[in-house]
Protein backbone atom coordinates (compact mmCIF):
# COMPACT_ATOMS: atom_id res chain seq x y z
CA UNK A 1 0.00 0.00 0.00
CA UNK A 2 2.74 2.47 0.96
CA UNK A 3 4.51 2.71 -2.46
CA UNK A 4 1.19 3.23 -4.26
CA UNK A 5 -0.03 5.83 -1.76
CA UNK A 6 3.30 7.66 -1.79
CA UNK A 7 3.34 7.80 -5.60
CA UNK A 8 -0.27 9.00 -5.72
CA UNK A 9 0.22 11.75 -3.14
CA UNK A 10 3.49 12.89 -4.73
CA UNK A 11 1.81 13.21 -8.13
CA UNK A 12 -1.14 15.03 -6.57
CA UNK A 13 1.20 17.44 -4.81
CA UNK A 14 3.09 18.10 -8.07
CA UNK A 15 -0.17 18.90 -9.85
CA UNK A 16 -1.24 21.26 -7.06
CA UNK A 17 2.10 23.09 -7.33
CA UNK A 18 1.75 23.27 -11.12
CA UNK A 19 -1.72 24.79 -10.64
CA UNK A 20 -0.20 27.47 -8.35
CA UNK A 21 -2.07 26.18 -5.30
CA UNK A 22 -0.77 28.22 -2.37
CA UNK A 23 -2.61 26.53 0.49
CA UNK A 24 -1.64 23.60 2.69
CA UNK A 25 -3.03 20.32 1.33
CA UNK A 26 -4.33 17.72 3.77
CA UNK A 27 -5.65 14.18 3.47
CA UNK A 28 -8.84 12.86 5.03
CA UNK A 29 -8.23 10.19 7.66
CA UNK A 30 -10.33 7.20 8.65
CA UNK A 31 -10.36 8.38 12.28
CA UNK A 32 -12.45 11.43 11.37
CA UNK A 33 -9.66 14.00 11.11
CA UNK A 34 -7.22 15.24 8.47
CA UNK A 35 -3.44 15.00 8.34
CA UNK A 36 -0.54 16.20 6.19
CA UNK A 37 0.67 14.50 3.03
CA UNK A 38 3.95 13.52 4.72
CA UNK A 39 2.29 11.90 7.73
CA UNK A 40 -0.16 10.06 5.50
CA UNK A 41 2.62 8.75 3.25
CA UNK A 42 4.30 7.29 6.34
CA UNK A 43 1.15 5.42 7.42
CA UNK A 44 -1.20 5.30 4.41
CA UNK A 45 -3.55 2.85 6.13
CA UNK A 46 -4.99 5.89 7.90
CA UNK A 47 -6.77 6.72 4.61
CA UNK A 48 -8.83 3.52 4.52
CA UNK A 49 -12.58 4.32 4.43
CA UNK A 50 -11.69 8.02 4.65
CA UNK A 51 -14.25 8.99 1.99
CA UNK A 52 -17.24 7.37 3.70
CA UNK A 53 -15.98 8.73 7.02
CA UNK A 54 -16.46 12.25 5.65
CA UNK A 55 -20.13 11.49 5.07
CA UNK A 56 -20.66 10.19 8.59
CA UNK A 57 -18.95 13.25 10.08
CA UNK A 58 -21.07 15.45 7.83
CA UNK A 59 -24.23 13.72 9.05
CA UNK A 60 -23.22 14.36 12.66
CA UNK A 61 -22.72 18.06 11.92
CA UNK A 62 -26.03 18.22 10.06
CA UNK A 63 -27.70 16.56 13.04
CA UNK A 64 -26.44 19.33 15.32
CA UNK A 65 -27.86 21.99 12.98
CA UNK A 66 -31.32 20.41 12.83
CA UNK A 67 -31.30 19.10 16.42
CA UNK A 68 -31.29 15.41 15.47
CA UNK A 69 -28.70 13.73 17.68
CA UNK A 70 -29.55 10.07 17.02
CA UNK A 71 -28.92 9.18 13.40
CA UNK A 72 -28.33 6.18 11.19
CA UNK A 73 -26.44 7.05 8.02
CA UNK A 74 -26.92 5.45 4.61
CA UNK A 75 -24.39 6.23 1.88
CA UNK A 76 -25.25 4.54 -1.42
CA UNK A 77 -22.75 4.94 -4.24
CA UNK A 78 -22.15 3.05 -7.44
CA UNK A 79 -20.58 -0.09 -5.99
CA UNK A 80 -21.37 -0.19 -2.27
CA UNK A 81 -23.77 0.93 0.44
CA UNK A 82 -22.27 2.05 3.73
CA UNK A 83 -24.00 2.49 7.07
CA UNK A 84 -23.04 3.95 10.43
CA UNK A 85 -24.73 4.99 13.66
CA UNK A 86 -24.49 8.28 15.53
CA UNK A 87 -25.67 8.28 19.15
CA UNK A 88 -26.24 11.54 21.04
CA UNK A 89 -24.30 13.36 18.34
CA UNK A 90 -21.24 11.15 18.80
CA UNK A 91 -19.61 9.27 15.93
CA UNK A 92 -18.38 5.85 17.00
CA UNK A 93 -14.67 5.08 16.60
CA UNK A 94 -13.33 1.51 16.70
CA UNK A 95 -9.84 0.00 16.54
CA UNK A 96 -10.72 -3.49 15.31
CA UNK A 97 -11.89 -2.68 11.79
CA UNK A 98 -11.58 -5.38 9.12
CA UNK A 99 -11.24 -4.75 5.38
CA UNK A 100 -13.03 -7.04 2.90
CA UNK A 101 -14.66 -9.02 5.70
CA UNK A 102 -17.66 -11.02 4.51
CA UNK A 103 -19.20 -14.47 4.62
CA UNK A 104 -16.53 -15.85 2.29
CA UNK A 105 -13.46 -14.01 3.58
CA UNK A 106 -12.02 -13.40 7.03
CA UNK A 107 -10.77 -10.02 5.82
CA UNK A 108 -7.72 -8.04 6.91
CA UNK A 109 -7.47 -6.31 10.30
CA UNK A 110 -6.68 -2.60 10.51
CA UNK A 111 -5.49 -1.90 14.05
CA UNK A 112 -5.96 1.85 13.80
CA UNK A 113 -8.80 4.18 14.86
CA UNK A 114 -11.55 4.00 12.23
CA UNK A 115 -15.09 5.38 12.21
CA UNK A 116 -17.40 2.38 12.68
CA UNK A 117 -18.84 1.73 9.21
CA UNK A 118 -20.54 -1.36 7.76
CA UNK A 119 -20.16 -1.81 4.02
CA UNK A 120 -21.95 -4.14 1.59
CA UNK A 121 -21.59 -4.67 -2.15
CA UNK A 122 -24.81 -3.00 -3.23
CA UNK A 123 -24.96 0.28 -5.13
CA UNK A 124 -26.33 1.87 -8.25
CA UNK A 125 -23.96 -0.12 -10.44
CA UNK A 126 -24.51 -3.48 -8.72
CA UNK A 127 -25.17 -6.21 -11.28
CA UNK A 128 -28.31 -8.37 -11.22
CA UNK A 129 -27.79 -12.00 -12.14
CA UNK A 130 -29.53 -15.38 -11.98
CA UNK A 131 -27.75 -18.47 -10.66
CA UNK A 132 -28.01 -22.06 -11.87
CA UNK A 133 -31.04 -22.59 -9.63
CA UNK A 134 -32.93 -19.66 -11.19
CA UNK A 135 -32.47 -17.50 -8.12
CA UNK A 136 -32.09 -13.76 -8.63
CA UNK A 137 -29.14 -11.96 -6.98
CA UNK A 138 -27.90 -8.37 -6.88
CA UNK A 139 -24.17 -7.66 -6.43
CA UNK A 140 -21.53 -7.75 -5.17
CA UNK A 141 -20.17 -7.42 -8.72
CA UNK A 142 -20.49 -3.92 -10.13
CA UNK A 143 -20.56 -2.39 -13.60
CA UNK A 144 -18.59 0.56 -12.23
CA UNK A 145 -18.70 3.96 -13.89
CA UNK A 146 -17.27 2.75 -17.19
CA UNK A 147 -19.06 1.17 -18.96
CA UNK A 148 -21.54 1.53 -16.10
CA UNK A 149 -25.24 0.60 -16.22
CA UNK A 150 -26.72 -0.41 -19.57
CA UNK A 151 -28.78 2.79 -19.56
CA UNK A 152 -25.59 4.88 -19.86
CA UNK A 153 -25.29 3.77 -23.48
CA UNK A 154 -21.56 3.18 -23.09
CA UNK A 155 -21.53 -0.53 -23.88
CA UNK A 156 -22.65 -1.96 -20.55
CA UNK A 157 -23.92 -5.53 -20.88
CA UNK A 158 -25.27 -6.28 -17.39
CA UNK A 159 -28.48 -5.02 -15.80
CA UNK A 160 -27.87 -2.96 -12.67
CA UNK A 161 -29.89 -1.47 -9.84
CA UNK A 162 -29.91 1.86 -11.69
CA UNK A 163 -31.41 0.21 -14.78
CA UNK A 164 -34.10 -1.40 -12.61
CA UNK A 165 -34.96 1.97 -11.08
CA UNK A 166 -35.36 3.41 -14.59
CA UNK A 167 -37.63 0.57 -15.74
CA UNK A 168 -39.94 1.13 -12.75
CA UNK A 169 -39.83 4.92 -13.25
CA UNK A 170 -38.28 5.46 -9.84
CA UNK A 171 -35.76 7.47 -11.89
CA UNK A 172 -37.18 9.89 -14.47
CA UNK A 173 -36.24 8.42 -17.85
CA UNK A 174 -36.54 11.86 -19.46
CA UNK A 175 -34.29 13.59 -16.93
CA UNK A 176 -31.61 10.97 -16.35
CA UNK A 177 -28.48 12.27 -14.60
CA UNK A 178 -29.95 15.76 -14.52
CA UNK A 179 -30.71 15.59 -18.22
CA UNK A 180 -27.05 15.15 -19.14
CA UNK A 181 -27.45 11.55 -20.34
CA UNK A 182 -30.21 10.16 -22.52
CA UNK A 183 -31.19 6.85 -20.95
CA UNK A 184 -30.82 4.04 -23.50
CA UNK A 185 -34.05 2.26 -22.58
CA UNK A 186 -34.04 0.11 -25.73
CA UNK A 187 -30.73 -1.43 -24.64
CA UNK A 188 -32.06 -1.84 -21.10
CA UNK A 189 -35.14 -3.74 -22.33
CA UNK A 190 -33.05 -6.03 -24.54
CA UNK A 191 -30.53 -6.74 -21.78
CA UNK A 192 -33.02 -7.52 -19.02
CA UNK A 193 -35.13 -9.76 -21.29
CA UNK A 194 -32.97 -12.92 -20.84
CA UNK A 195 -33.19 -12.56 -17.05
CA UNK A 196 -36.96 -12.12 -17.25
CA UNK A 197 -37.31 -15.14 -19.51
CA UNK A 198 -35.30 -17.31 -17.14
CA UNK A 199 -37.36 -16.13 -14.16
CA UNK A 200 -40.65 -16.27 -16.13
CA UNK A 201 -41.34 -12.63 -15.22
CA UNK A 202 -42.14 -9.53 -17.21
CA UNK A 203 -39.30 -7.00 -17.44
CA UNK A 204 -41.00 -4.75 -14.90
CA UNK A 205 -41.51 -7.65 -12.47
CA UNK A 206 -37.83 -8.52 -12.77
CA UNK A 207 -36.87 -4.89 -12.15
CA UNK A 208 -39.07 -4.75 -9.05
CA UNK A 209 -37.44 -7.96 -7.83
CA UNK A 210 -33.97 -6.44 -8.32
CA UNK A 211 -34.95 -3.41 -6.26
CA UNK A 212 -36.46 -5.54 -3.49
CA UNK A 213 -33.32 -7.67 -3.24
CA UNK A 214 -31.08 -4.59 -3.20
CA UNK A 215 -33.25 -3.08 -0.46
CA UNK A 216 -33.10 -6.29 1.55
CA UNK A 217 -29.31 -6.31 1.37
CA UNK A 218 -29.21 -2.71 2.60
CA UNK A 219 -31.65 -3.51 5.42
CA UNK A 220 -29.25 -6.19 6.64
CA UNK A 221 -26.44 -3.61 6.69
CA UNK A 222 -28.60 -1.14 8.63
CA UNK A 223 -29.39 -3.87 11.15
CA UNK A 224 -25.69 -4.60 11.62
CA UNK A 225 -25.09 -1.06 12.92
CA UNK A 226 -28.30 -0.89 14.95
CA UNK A 227 -30.33 -3.97 15.95
CA UNK A 228 -27.31 -6.28 16.14
CA UNK A 229 -25.65 -3.84 18.56
CA UNK A 230 -28.67 -3.40 20.79
CA UNK A 231 -30.11 -0.22 19.25
CA UNK A 232 -33.75 0.23 18.25
CA UNK A 233 -33.98 1.86 14.78
CA UNK A 234 -37.24 3.51 15.86
CA UNK A 235 -35.18 5.77 18.14
CA UNK A 236 -33.17 7.14 15.21
CA UNK A 237 -33.63 9.19 12.05
CA UNK A 238 -32.17 7.99 8.75
CA UNK A 239 -29.81 10.32 6.86
CA UNK A 240 -29.48 9.19 3.24
CA UNK A 241 -26.87 10.50 0.84
CA UNK A 242 -24.64 9.43 -2.02
CA UNK A 243 -25.89 9.09 -5.57
CA UNK A 244 -28.48 6.44 -4.68
CA UNK A 245 -29.22 7.05 -1.00
CA UNK A 246 -32.47 8.93 -1.52
CA UNK A 247 -33.66 6.32 -4.01
CA UNK A 248 -33.91 3.59 -1.40
CA UNK A 249 -34.17 5.43 1.93
CA UNK A 250 -37.94 5.59 2.37
CA UNK A 251 -38.45 1.89 1.64
CA UNK A 252 -35.73 0.96 4.13
CA UNK A 253 -37.10 3.31 6.79
CA UNK A 254 -40.57 1.84 6.37
CA UNK A 255 -39.24 -1.69 6.79
CA UNK A 256 -37.34 -0.80 9.98
CA UNK A 257 -40.02 1.58 11.35
CA UNK A 258 -37.58 4.50 11.31
CA UNK A 259 -39.83 7.55 11.85
CA UNK A 260 -37.93 10.17 9.84
CA UNK A 261 -35.83 10.25 6.67
CA UNK A 262 -33.46 13.16 6.07
CA UNK A 263 -32.07 13.76 2.58
CA UNK A 264 -29.58 16.66 2.57
CA UNK A 265 -29.36 19.24 -0.19
CA UNK A 266 -26.79 18.12 -2.79
CA UNK A 267 -26.86 14.69 -1.17
CA UNK A 268 -24.85 13.09 -3.99
CA UNK A 269 -21.79 15.11 -2.90
CA UNK A 270 -22.65 15.24 0.80
CA UNK A 271 -19.41 13.53 1.84
CA UNK A 272 -17.46 16.39 0.23
CA UNK A 273 -19.46 18.82 2.37
CA UNK A 274 -18.60 16.78 5.44
CA UNK A 275 -14.93 16.82 4.49
CA UNK A 276 -14.93 20.62 4.44
CA UNK A 277 -15.80 20.64 8.16
CA UNK A 278 -13.04 18.30 9.38
CA UNK A 279 -10.29 19.33 11.81
CA UNK A 280 -6.60 18.38 11.77
CA UNK A 281 -6.07 15.18 13.71
CA UNK A 282 -3.17 12.80 14.27
CA UNK A 283 -3.61 9.51 16.13
CA UNK A 284 -1.29 8.80 19.05
CA UNK A 285 1.54 6.55 17.94
CA UNK A 286 3.30 4.13 20.31
CA UNK A 287 6.91 4.79 21.26
CA UNK A 288 9.10 1.69 21.29
CA UNK A 289 12.24 1.74 23.44
CA UNK A 290 14.67 -1.15 23.66
CA UNK A 291 14.66 -2.54 27.20
CA UNK A 292 18.46 -3.01 27.09
CA UNK A 293 19.05 0.58 25.99
CA UNK A 294 16.63 1.82 28.63
CA UNK A 295 18.56 -0.04 31.38
CA UNK A 296 21.91 1.33 30.17
CA UNK A 297 20.61 4.86 30.44
Sequence positions of predicted segments:
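Nucleotide/phosphate-binding catalytic cleft detector across ATP-hydrolyzing
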Residues: 1-71, 186-235, 246
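Short glycine-aspartate micro-motif
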Residues: 47, 69-75, 117-119, 262
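A short acidic Gly-Thr/Ser loop motif
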Residues: 52, 74-80, 120-123, 241-245
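Mobile "lid/hinge" segments at catalytic clefts and subdomain interfaces of large enzymes
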Residues: 81, 87, 116, 123-188
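Phosphate/diphosphate-binding loops
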Residues: 83, 87, 95-136, 251-262
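Conserved phosphate-binding/catalytic loops in two-lobed NTP-binding clefts
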Residues: 258-273
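Single conserved hydrophobic/aromatic residue that forms the stacking wall/gate
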Residues: 278-297
Amino acid sequence: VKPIARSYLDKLNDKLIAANFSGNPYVMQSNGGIDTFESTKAIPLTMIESGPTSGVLGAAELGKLIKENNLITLDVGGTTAKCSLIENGNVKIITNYWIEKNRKSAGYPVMLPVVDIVEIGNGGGSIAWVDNYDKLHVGPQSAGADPGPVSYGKGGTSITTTDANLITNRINQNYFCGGEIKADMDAVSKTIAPLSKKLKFTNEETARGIIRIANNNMINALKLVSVNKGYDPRDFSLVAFGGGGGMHATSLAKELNIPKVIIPVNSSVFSAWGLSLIHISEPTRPLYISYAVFCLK
